[in-house]
Amino acid sequence: MQDQSSLPTLVLIHGLFSSPLEFALVSQILRSRGVRFEFLEIPGYTLADRRRPTSWRDWLQAASAALDARYGPDEPIVLGGLCVGGALAAALATSVAAQARPQRVCGVAMLSPTFEYDGWSLTPWRHLRRLGYALGLSRWITIREREPFGIKNPKIRKWVVREFEASDLSSIGPSRLPLWGLRESERLHAHVRPLLRALPVPLLVLHAREDEIASVAGVERWTSALGSSARLIVLEHSYHMITIDNDRQRVAHELADFVGAPKNARGVPRPVAPVSKLAQHVA
């Protein structure tokens, strides 16, 4: 059995302008499997002020600085992220390899990657976003989150609705996203897509068949060209927010397997993970 102390740290990056609360429901299982996990909070990306635009290059630079400050050459890590966070994880991994930086990246996990915005819930009006980009309106237009909020489970979805009724921020992130953030996320994915072929470490992709934001067909199109270094797992019981939805337990176990945690591992003390009211409600 592998010594748990030798396992890489799983470094998780949340989705666009959200927070580590997106991982609250998978944290308990990761801890029970003996996985050392931490969350990367990125200035200008984590709970970003939508009135102060930042670019994807700013996000990547800030994330790189956070890695440099936290992890040294003797600390192997696996980078993972949800939605846009997955693209940041892949970009970081290629950056670390290209620049001979001190971290030892052992793998990348992309959860619900948005290689293309082509999910079933998106109407033809989504194409108008490009007009907003072209006219320079991205700074003033916001997009309201709406049902199903990336969640198939009706009980959890109702809880998120109540969170949004009380606040502009919920377990899945802010109630509105600025158009400039969406534009920068698309630019980030355009940067990452060609880099995946040269990704120097194993890639795990977890994606829901019924993802309403990005179709599984689009994800399959990109991962199928990567060969044996990439593994795509299609989840059958969730929408986009797979760390919160019905498949959250499988997501946690797949991540634990990916970092090499023994299946019969006993939990060890870890830094306290964020606990949302949703996590307390579902537990």
Per-range role (PLM):
Residues L177-L195:
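Active-site nucleophile elbow and catalytic-triad environment of alpha/beta-hydrolase enzymes
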Residues R231, E236-A283:
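Catalytic active-site module of serine/aspartate enzymes centered on a nucleophile-bearing elbow/loop
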Residues E212-G218:
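Conserved alpha/beta-hydrolase "acid-adjacent" motif
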Residues L16-S27:
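The serine-hydrolase catalytic nucleophile loop
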Residues L199, V205-H207, D211:
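Short beta-strand/loop motif that positions the catalytic acidic residue
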Residues S27-D49:
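Conserved alpha/beta-hydrolase
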Residues E38, V219-E220, S224-M241:
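Catalytic histidine neighborhood in serine/cysteine hydrolases
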